[in-house]
Design a protein with these regions (language model features):
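Membrane-embedded catalytic scaffold of the fatty acid hydroxylase/desaturase
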Residues: 14-33, 37-38, 53-201
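Membrane-helix interface linkers and caps
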Residues: 1-9, 32-52
Length: 201
């Protein structure tokens, strides 16, 4: 918490917060994506399909929440891989990997260009998911929330996702680690050992 690396995390977090406050209104918004996709679906299909009527609202809400969580995780995984694989993107992402000691604020140690990429990724995922579900299910679409977060995001964070960048090394039962990355696995991702480079995305 008091190391030079931690203080660098705090500074980068503060600078990025200021930059994103200025840039956010100018970055692609999920509402824009949702509108464009929703409008395109109306051009592709004449009217909304009536085959999907009569489905219980809770089923739609749970399906939408799960779909959004899975698509978001899938997109985050691939963007993270590309940040390591593409030299230009690595030049941004290496700022995050420059931390010599992990703490919960290390998650915010990102180059502003990386923050913009993740913002665009989020807008695309949320916009596409919202448009598709609203097209097929109309105003029955809602998220299943716990304390202001998607139930799946809440459970994921409760299981230790928020500890990925902390010095606490928590492992899950091996079959769970095949699906969800534990903090211990993410610590390996940040390791500088040769055998750990570009592992555990």
């Amino acid at each position: 918490w008091g190391s030079a690396s931690a203080f660098a995390d705090y500074k980068v977090m503060f600078i990025n917060a200021l930059l994103m406050t200025l840039l956010s209104p100018r970055i692609l918004a999920k509402a824009t994506v949702a509108y464009l996709i929703f409008d395109s679906l109306h051009l592709l299909f004449e009217g909304r399909p009536s085959v999907l009527t009569g489905i219980p609202q809770w089923t739609i809400a749970l399906s939408f929440t799960l779909f959004l969580f899975i698509l978001d995780d899938f997109a985050r995984y691939w963007l993270h891989r590309w940040l390591h694989a593409i030299p230009l993107l690595w030049s941004f992402h290496k700022v995050h990997h420059s931390a010599s000691a992990l703490n919960p604020f290390t998650v915010f140690r990102t180059h502003p260009a990386e923050a913009i990429l993740f913002s665009v990724r989020s807008a695309l995922v949320q916009g596409i998911s919202t448009a598709v579900f609203f097209f097929f299910f109309g105003n029955q679409v809602t998220l299943v929330m716990v304390l202001g977060a998607s139930i799946f995001t809440f459970a994921f964070n409760l299981l230790g996702s928020n500890l990925r960048h902390s010095p606490v090394s928590i492992s899950y039962w091996h079959p769970i680690e095949l699906i969800l990355m534990s903090p211990a696995q993410h610590h390996i991702h940040h390791s500088t050992a040769e055998e750990h480079i570009d592992r555990n995305f």
